[in-house]
Amino acid sequence: MGLLSLAIWTPIFFGVVLLALGRDDQARMVRWLALIGSLVSLLVTLPLYSRFDTSSSAMQFVEKTPWIERFNVWYHLGVDGIAFWFILLTAFITVVVVISAWEVITERVNQYMGAFLILSGLMIGVFCALDGILFYTFFEATLIPMYLIIGIWGGPNKIYAAFKFFLYTLLGSLLMLVALIYLYTKAGGSFEILTWHKLPLSMSAQTLLFFAFLAAFAVKVPMWPVHTWLPDVHVEAPTGGSAVLAAIMLKLGAYGFLRFSLPIAPDAAHEYAWLMIGLSIIAVIYVGLVAMVQQDMKKLVAYSSVAHMGFVTLGFFIFSDIGVSGGLVQMIAHGFVSAAMFLCIGVLYDRVHSRQIASYGGVVNTMPNFAAFAILFAMANCGLPATAGFVGEWMVILGAVKANFWLGLAAATALIFGAAYTLWMVKRVYLGPIANDDVRALTDINAREFLMLSLLAIAVLYMGLYPKPFTDVMNASVADLLKHVSASKL
């Protein structure tokens, strides 16, 4: 087995073993097995980093075996600088989520942990797949564990949220399947994504393909106006579900743009860049304003996710190396920061069982250690320099200003809104006098919660202070992608 196959199938194997274990009286063993499984899965991805050649833009660690020979479908994996960090991010966040669920999930523990490990493997599969059908299989299969996680361990409205999540994302993907089959016939019966990149296509074909992929990926990102499923799902999902959804699942859509929309339909991408930039700016400004009036902490962070992902799509469609790299860095940073924000809300929810901002106030007085973490992550969420949240946003704004000054100005206003809604939440939840008896009775974080938050805090600070390892890996691949996209296929 190659390294990428190990990265995909190790967590899935542990997940299936956990599902087979069954009863809740084995919960303690199940938790330890889940932790061991997630740690092994993370360790399996580490050799990728030491062996990755940052100077090359080619696919690395390639594996290719026939899968469905009749239709020329291959089990074809490979990773370049664009996909590389998301494999490590997925494995890392899975470890944190297993730790976060330790004492919190008490019913059907084996199914909960199993679902997360299987989901982790499937998401890594999306980032490695180089065959259209393989990509589609992994992309759609991620819906199933997430649907169960929301529908079984979610809040009071969980069934509605799970259905909404499933239908929205599934309907978008159906158009993508049509696009994949069209490309298959065009390419003489090949599902190779890299072959599709070289296909000469007419403008009308590119336009249809571009919008078919847009339907699938915009829902996943989610871009405005198809973002309405996200706040509902985040509010109902359990803490771990929210963390994985925000940190990794949203990235599958943005990754799809770079792997499909831009290289397969470059002329259409340039033609409709104004549309994508417009939708991104709306997401960044309008959704930022919507976040300011939220009373529910999870909804606030959910809307802030839409605004942050607006930066990502903006960076991609200004077609400059600093913009695309900035978008990728923002995706990784948002993975750390959004997971941390949701886990912090989970820490409070486990104690008070309320997500309403009005239920809190003066938490810093009773939980000083926790408040220090929470405020650090909040600062990263508004893009404070020296935190992960700053680097990507700054790169995208720099790229936007180079492309068009007014565009850069519009993007920069988002930082003001980001600071406004985040700091307002911090002020009302953490600062000031103790608001009520619930807050007075709070106990500070235990060792498990401290470990989970400190892992993320280290990641957020390291990435903010020294982003070079992150950008070095992607530079060659981003340059190659832009060279490809700048050449017309007509």
Predicted regions and their residues:
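C-terminal ends of transmembrane helices
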Residues: 16-27, 94-106, 148-158, 220-235, ...
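Structural signature of hydrophobic alpha-helical transmembrane segments
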Residues: 1-10, 79-90, 132-145, 206-219, ...
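Predominantly late transmembrane helices and immediately cytosolic-facing juxtamembrane segments
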Residues: 224, 338-341, 408-441
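Central hydrophobic cores of alpha-helical transmembrane segments in multi-pass inner-membrane proteins
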Residues: 5-21, 35-50, 89-101, 119-121, ...
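Alpha-helical transmembrane segments of multipass membrane proteins
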Residues: 15-20, 46, 95-99, 121-125, ...
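Transmembrane helix-loop-helix hairpins at membrane boundaries of multipass inner-membrane proteins
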Residues: 2-3, 17-114, 190, 194-198, ...
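Juxtamembrane/interfacial segments at transmembrane-helix boundaries in multi-pass membrane proteins
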Residues: 52-74, 173-228, 232, 257-275, ...
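Alpha-helical multi-pass transmembrane bundles of energy-transducing inner-membrane proteins
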Residues: 24-29, 114-118, 122-205, 290-303, ...
